[in-house]
Amino acid sequence: MAREKFERKKQHVNIGTIGHVDHGKTTLTAAITMCLQSFSKNKGKRYDEIDSAPEEKARGITINTAHVEYETENRHYAHVDCPGHADYVKNMITGAAQMDGAILVVSGADGPMPQTKEHLLLAKQVGVPTLVVFLNKEDQVDDPELLELVELEVRETLDKYEYPGDDIPIIAGSALLALEALIENPNVKPGENEWVDKILKLMQNVDTYIPTPVRETDKTFLMAVEDVFSITGRGTVATGLVERGTLKTGATVEIIGLRDTTTTTVTGLEMFQKTLDETVAGDNVGVLLRGVQKDNIQRGMVLAAPGTIKPHTKFEAQVYILTKEEGGRHTPFFPGYRPQFYVRTTDVTGKIESFTADDGSEALMATSGDRLKMVVELIQPIAVENGMRFAIREGGRTVGAGVVSTILK
């Protein structure tokens, strides 16, 4: 059966849900898709269709980032339901790096919890520019004053992580009660159910408060590979977020990083089960590649316009070392330290060879709160360019965040 074409009629925005485990992120995602199905041809998704990994169902927690799509009157959204559990922050780094804005879900019954704060810190580090807050489980809070206190605490927490706490819209509601109402009657109209109306109000705020991102469509094409599938009879598909530029079917691309660079032709493009002639920056797309075996391409590689980006192993970077209050290390580290470097969709072990202080003198160690330059050598080559951002992590915690300043090798 031929796939229908994806029609680009509305502005496309990538958003996601972040927040503490069990505060209701996936339930909210399901409620939003069902609530908005009248604006698009897409069917709403039930909770169990979003919560997809078997391990999640067993533990009732979300691990892999699940992509769903929905539309409001003005926009087309791709929505990432982000992991809510400490061990899965790794996926948040690769999943959240793709958000133009996020909905922070906080339980009105609990208020901000440790992971709420960890996700806010990560959102700041990976550059999620704007947030809207959904204060969930409002039905479980009997006293309106308690809810006001929680809202106040949320605003203070946002301020602490350098988000404008006074300005960010906070909408209270119950994702579960809205979802139950929508399952009972999928055609609920605005004004018929107070809980469904609160979801609509949330999405109106997302529409107006999260700005439409300026896409870098005039630059050369680059997409980090997030996943690889093989389709019988058609070949290998690499999926990911187009970071910049545009790509048409029939174009030549290079596959770069982790092993030798290869060149191939794009034989097809797909987004949300529909075909495209051209993909642009900001799309979550599947790229069908001619003559590439599934084993020859993996997560962490990039597809790029030929000759535009090269694999490197050694660079100098400007780095900020997190304080322990921000979730960083409690002790300093020295040259020779070998943490993980998270870049786009991959993590690679690297050795930190030397530090330089701001004044140009050699620093003997890096302690929390430092801003310094460091020379890093990775154990595998990946696509690196000046201005590229990365996170440094070790044993489940983020140690630092940096930007490549000079490529050395």
Curated annotation (Swiss-Prot):
Region (G4): 136-139
UniProt xrefs under CDD domains: EF_Tu (cd01884), EFTU_II (cd03697), EFTU_III (cd03707)
Region feature (G3): 81-84
Top-rank lineage group of the source organism: Eukaryota
Chain positions recorded as GTP binding sites: 19-26, 81-85, 136-139
EC number annotated for this UniProt entry: 3.6.5.3
Catalytic activities: GTP + H2O = GDP + phosphate + H(+)
Region described as G5: spans on this chain: 174-176
Molecular functions per Gene Ontology: GTP binding; GTPase activity; translation elongation factor activity
GO cellular component, one term: mitochondrion
NCBIfam families per the UniProt record, alphabetical: EF-Tu (TIGR00485), PRK00049.1 (NF000766), PRK12735.1 (NF009372), PRK12736.1 (NF009373), small_GTP (TIGR00231)
Name listed for the protein in its UniProt record: Elongation factor Tu, chloroplastic
Originating species: Tupiella akineta (Green alga)
